[in-house]
Amino acid sequence: MVLVHEGDQVATPQSPDTCPVVPGPGSRIAAGLDPEIDLVISGHSHQAYICKIKDPAGQDRYHTQGSSFGRIITQIDFRVDRKTRDVIRSSVSADNHVVTRTITPDPEVEAYVQTWKERVSVVANRPVGNITATIARDPSGAGESPLGNLIADAQLEAAREGGAEIALMNPGGVRADLTYPASGSEGDGVVTYGEAFTVQPFNNLVQVVTLTGEQLRRLLEQQWTESYTRVLQPSASLTYTADLTKPIGSRVSDIKINGIPVTDTQRIRVAANNFLIGGGDGFTVFTEGTELWSGPLDIDAFVAYLSAHSPVDPPATDRITFIR
């Protein structure tokens, strides 16, 4: 069996045991894997589904996902041939169960969790910086968010050693707001390590690759597809115009770095997390990049920026000019 961090979207919410998916990268991976694989457990898209997909040999195999944040538990049962030690494909069954939280907590598990909460709190409650107001992850009408822009600025600063000129952050990787009201006893406007980690919890590396101006334009065009829109959060050094009245693939113009127009042949050092550099969220142009440089973890870059620039104001969301 294969566990893969990629999945599909659900067209309309239905029972978690059904398969109302819009075929996407998860289905394509599940359909293309070796016929010897009997089960594909997917993730990433935070959906609930139990599907059967034909493998390359034309045989059905399960392709499942159990939503996110512990809301669904996928129960998978199968038998193994004792002689061959192979999974009997016809015996595989899968069911998604909604977590209702109606069961009595196990005292031993609760005690174990509490022990680690107390140990982690020493690190989590450590102040790392200050903010002047809540810095939100929700995008503005231009598709930018103050927090997304802040993270891009932090990653650009952390990647200067790798020659970075601009940075781009995927909006899905911004997991929570930085709130001005205190979450504990730290005081209003104080950012703790735990709060910063909640914003950036993936431990991705900040990396840099070289793209041409033409490749950067194609990368930015990948923000819009027939299925979805994902606006990359730009560092302050990058500005451009996006004309939404034009066809998909022809919307981006007037790209500038530090106010200077970008040419197609120009070589640009672009910073992003390793998820994006690997082509994640459909930004495949990143994989054309050369001269890879790897730097710090994204959380370390974020914490360092907050510490160095406190108190931090919410960045303006004026780096992309939209025409509608």
For each predicted feature, which ranges?
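Short, ordered loop/turn segments at secondary-structure junctions
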Residues: 5-7, 44-46, 68, 171-173, ...
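Feature captures C-terminal
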Residues: 53-62, 72, 86-88, 94, ...
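Conserved protein kinase catalytic core
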Residues: 11, 48-50, 176
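Divalent metal-coordination and catalytic microenvironments
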Residues: 1-2, 40, 44, 78, ...
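Glycine-rich phosphate/diphosphate-binding loops and the adjacent beta-loop-alpha structural elements
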Residues: 125-144
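Generic alpha-helical structural element
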Residues: 18, 105, 120, 140, ...
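Short acidic, glycine-rich surface-loop motifs adjacent to enzyme active sites
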Residues: 1-15
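Active-site-adjacent helix-turn-beta-strand microarchitecture at beta-sheet edges
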Residues: 18-126, 227-231, 247-253
